[in-house]
Swiss-Prot record:
CDD domains given in the database record: ATP-synt_Fo_b
Listed GO MF terms: proton-transporting ATP synthase activity, rotational mechanism; proton-transporting ATPase activity, rotational mechanism
GO cellular component: plasma membrane; proton-transporting ATP synthase complex
Organism field: Bradyrhizobium sp. (strain ORS 278)
InterPro entries registered for this protein in UniProt: ATP_synth_b/b'su_bac/chlpt, ATP_synthase_B_chain
Presence of keyword Signal: no
Name of protein: ATP synthase subunit b 1
């Protein structure tokens, strides 16, 4: 047996057994198990939290996809509405412009016709005035005296009345 006590492995084994006994007496195994259980609980909680966060992220992603689709539809409706409104405004503007041009053309034609009529009346009046002056001159030179003056006055009045 002495021989066993001289062997260093024996002393290591004895120290190990004493250490394990001391650990058992002090309840180290319970502390280790408790720490392992605590770690397992923490890992389980972290896994549950990760699953919850994953589910929440999936819900948020689905919500954003729905919102995005809705926003795209709304934007498309706005663009369609804006195009229709622009076409309607363009058609209204074209109709108003055509109406304006037609009215301006008609007004210009009316002014031209009025100017033509006025010019014709002015020419007639000038011709009548010239004819009256010429007749007055001719009659006054050919007929002398009171009878001539009466005839000239009557003739001028009659010509003026007929020409105007």
């Amino acid at each position: 047996m002495m021989h066993l006590l001289a062997d260093p492995e024996t002393w290591v084994a004895i120290a190990f057994v004493i250490l394990m006994g001391l650990f058992a007496y002090l309840g180290v195994h319970r502390m280790v198990l408790k720490a392992l259980d605590h770690r397992a609980d923490r890992i389980r909680d972290e896994l549950a939290e990760a699953k919850r966060l994953k589910d929440e992220a999936a819900k948020v992603l689905a919500d954003y996809k729905t919102r995005r689709a809705s926003a795209e539809r709304e934007a498309e409706e706005i663009v369609t509405s804006a195009k229709a409104e622009a076409e309607r405004i363009a058609a209204d503007a074209k109709a108003k412009m055509e109406d304006f041009v037609a009215r301006r053309t008609k007004a210009a034609e009316s002014k031209i016709a009025l100017a033509e009529a006025q010019a014709l009346a002015d020419v007639r009046a000038a011709a009548a005035e010239a004819a009256v002056q010429a007749a007055a001159t001719v009659l006054s030179q050919s007929v002398k005296g009171g009878l001539g003056d009466d005839l000239v006055a009557k003739g001028i009045a009659e010509v003026s009345r007929k020409l105007n």
